[in-house]
UniProtKB/Swiss-Prot annotation:
Manganese found in the keyword field: yes
Family: Belongs to the phosphopentomutase family.
Protein name: Phosphopentomutase
Pathway the protein takes part in: Carbohydrate degradation; 2-deoxy-D-ribose 1-phosphate degradation; D-glyceraldehyde 3-phosphate and acetaldehyde from 2-deoxy-alpha-D-ribose 1-phosphate: step 1/2
Record bears the keyword Transferase: no
CDD domains documented for this protein: PPM
Organism superkingdom: Bacteria
Keywords associated with the record: Cytoplasm, Isomerase, Manganese, Metal-binding
Organism, scientific name: Streptococcus uberis (strain ATCC BAA-854 / 0140J)
Function in brief: Isomerase that catalyzes the conversion of deoxy-ribose 1-phosphate (dRib-1-P) and ribose 1-phosphate (Rib-1-P) to deoxy-ribose 5-phosphate (dRib-5-P) and ribose 5-phosphate (Rib-5-P), respectively.
Note on how the cofactor is bound: Binds 2 manganese ions.
UniProt binding sites for Mn(2+) 1: D13, D339, H340
Main location: cytoplasm
Length: 403
């Protein structure tokens, strides 16, 4: 059994690998998720060229149908499998929290028909700004600013919308509603959505810039989450004095709980990879865990149902993967996974209920191949066993498989 000095977990946000067994219990625009397959459909529809992930074993992961343009490796350099979600949700928080060992049996509240008048009125009274009622429904984040951004620029009204996720999002043009004001309004919205019937996973500030017809969301997004309801493996590590580094929106997702080094938000996937490599190179980071989220797959291409853009984003990550591998020390372990699906060829605009891939690599590996299929929380149990801390609620370690 290997024991690694450092483990680096990279979440490719929304890069699912085929419909989960219970996918038909979830839907997009009235269409059950049972036929969703993020990687499979991208590979089939627009082609997928990811030789570096293929070398680690991406094409070796068992599937009903092989990935069309990602061949299995006869001698992969890593271990591979797919993992199933048990929690009742397909949102970012649920996925990440389960990866860190929690089972979410009661999902957060979602608002398919928009938020109740009581919430909107409270936000209006607090902010002194009106809320655009027509935007108050599940909406694509880019479409909502295209549709209501011009009106906001004229009136200063707030754009409040939601999605299939348990989130309240406030979009604000940075020249009309300053960032400090937007963040203050979001903090208030967080304070009034902490219990049922409006228990939301996140309040998200969605600033943007530009002119009508050419709006662009900025990297000044900020998430206001709730802390996990029980200790995750992040907390177990932190309590044991083991370093935990967060790259990208990880700190927001866990509300800082169990994280003792926040490396900041990502401006892009490429910036996030730069930050990860910088983190891996820190001389003080001798032992511990880094946790990175790369969100562009989901935010820029999955929700927009842009299969070509999604494919290109995967290509860009794959091209930079050798840099990550080169930054590893001999006794490091790299885990690459996802948190849910977001099939860009599917109905609707929201996440899809899918298996997630898992690729594992270490310079110290003497073996490779496919390991048994498991569940999201197995990642956290493996991390816990490696560092000698107690696991969280659920999960079975696969550390013994990594040789």
């Amino acid at each position: 059994m290997s024991t690694f000095d450092r483990i680096h977990l990279v979440v490719l946000d929304s890069v699912g690998i085929g419909a989960a067994p219970d996918a038909n219990n979830f839907q997009n625009a009235g269409v059950p998720d049972g036929a969703s397959d993020t990687l499979g459909h991208i590979s089939k529809a627009v082609g997928l060229d990811v030789p570096n992930m293929a070398k680690l074993g991406l094409g070796n992961i068992p599937r009903p149908q092989a990935l069309k343009t990602v061949a299995a490796e006869s001698n992969p350099t890593g271990y591979a499998t797919k993992l199933e979600e048990v929690s009742l949700g397909k949102d970012t928080m649920t996925g990440h929290w389960e990866i860190m060992g929690l089972n979410i049996t009661e999902p957060f509240d979602t608002f398919w028909n928009g938020f109740p008048e009581e919430i909107l009125t409270k936000i209006e009274e607090f902010s002194g700004r009106k809320v655009i009622r027509e935007a108050n429904k599940p909406y694509s984040g880019t479409a909502v600013i295209d549709d209501f951004g011009p009106r906001q620029m004229e009136t200063g009204e707030l754009i409040i919308y939601t999605s299939a996720d348990p989130v309240l999002q406030i979009a604000a043009h940075e020249d009309i509603i300053p960032l400090e004001e937007l963040y203050r309004i979001c903090e208030y919205a967080r304070s009034i959505t902490l219990e049922r019937p409006a228990l939301l996973g996140r309040i998200i500030a969605r600033p943007y810039v530009g002119e009508p017809g050419n709006f662009t969301r900025t990297s000044n997004r900020h998430d206001y989450a709730v802390s996990p309801f029980e200790d995750t493996v992040l907390n177990k590590l932190d309590q044991a004095g083991i370093d935990t580094y967060a790259v990208g929106k990880i700190n927001d997702i866990f509300n800082g709980s169990g994280i003792n080094h926040d490396m900041g938000h990502n401006k892009s996937n490429s910036h996030g990879i730069d930050t990860l490599i910088k983190t891996m190179g820190l001389t003080a980071f001798e032992k511990g865990f880094s946790f990175t989220n790369l969100v562009d797959f989901d935010a820029l291409y999955g929700h927009r149902r842009d299969a070509f853009g999604y494919r290109d984003c995967l290509h860009e990550f794959d091209q930079r993967l050798p840099e990550i591998l080169s930054a590893m020390r001999d006794n490091d372990l790299l885990l690459i996974t996802a948190d849910h699906g977001n099939d860009p060829t599917y109905a609707g605009t929201d996440h899809t209920r899918e298996f997630i891939p898992l690729l594992a690599y270490s310079p110290s590996f003497k073996g490779s191949g496919v390991i048994p299929q498991g569940h999201f929380a197995d990642i956290s149990a493996t991390i816990a066993e490696n560092f000698g801390v107690e696991r969280a609620m659920i999960g079975q370690s696969f550390l013994a498989e990594l040789k």
